[in-house]
Amino acid sequence: MTYSGLKSLVTGLLIGDNVIPKDDAVMKSLLSYAFDMIANKAEALRLMTINSTEEIIRLGPGEYLVRKPNLPELDTDELDIDHELCFVAARYIAAMLSKEKIKIHQDYGDDGILRYNGKVYQILEKVEIEKKMLCENEGCTNEY
């Protein structure tokens, strides 16, 4: 999703409630805050790294680190998080801006992270099983 797409989505989520800020610096600050919340709660595949020179937010699963997402510079830039988590970012921003539906947006965002994390854990488990099977077939002497 592009930054412009995110702004359009947040605008739609706030219909009849509030509007997004006209000042793009304010919108990017809200996005930065939403990204921070997501990076601290979600096992975002796109944010997982083993490169400790990047700005790290926390430890991830296994040997992975979770890096800080980069903010977009232009409206046409793709958001630096997994596609499914873009909708979570929109909900968190809508919660920050909403006058009447704060809890609804927050709950939808939190639910999106729970569903996303469930999928990621299934993927990581499958990868570990496949690594183990590959190692057994090739006669690895290491753990994998």
Segments (PLM) and residue ranges:
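Generic detection of long, well-ordered alpha-helical segments
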Residues: 24-31, 83, 106, 110-113
